């Protein structure tokens, strides 16, 4: 007996509940103050795979104090991501070690990460079995810029 199940559509499903021949992608961020830049990134990421898993960083400032603590609660960010049509599955993590564990245990074929990481070491970059796709950033949307606008600071 195989570990596959057949879903309502008659396609073979893996133990994770998706088609066994689907190409699975993974991207991660804190997704604080979800904005147009995040949506464009998730759209581009979803175009690289059949099933997109998102790693939701609970609080980047825990390990890196120079990073901004999220303004929105984890619950708010989860609700927003759950409502995004480009996201198929969400896993939370706090530390880079937890992210590494996700990368090592989830059935990921492609890691999707920002183009600013090209040529740099990043969590999971040593995992040779992952293909890496670098998201483009051809827009000006950012959480930092949004925070400045909210605080009436010059952009």
Regions found by a protein language model. Give the residues of each.
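Nucleotidyltransferase catalytic core that binds NTPs
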Residues: 1-155
């Amino acid at each position: 007996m195989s570990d596959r199940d057949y879903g309502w559509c008659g396609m073979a499903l893996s133990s994770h509940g998706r088609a066994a021949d689907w190409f699975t992608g993974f991207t991660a961020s804190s997704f604080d103050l979800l904005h147009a830049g995040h949506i464009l990134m998730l759209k581009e990421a979803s175009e690289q795979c059949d099933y997109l898993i998102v790693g939701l960083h609970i609080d980047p400032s825990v390990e890196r104090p120079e990073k901004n603590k999220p303004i929105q609660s984890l619950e708010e960010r989860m609700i927003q991501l759950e409502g995004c049509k480009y996201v198929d599955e969400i896993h939370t993590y706090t530390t880079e070690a937890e992210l590494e564990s996700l990368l090592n245990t989830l059935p990921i074929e492609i890691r999707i990460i920002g183009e600013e990481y090209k040529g740099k070491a990043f969590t999971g970059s040593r995992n040779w079995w992952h293909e890496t796709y670098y998201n483009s950033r051809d827009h000006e949307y950012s959480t930092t810029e949004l925070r400045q606008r909210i605080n009436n600071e010059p952009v």
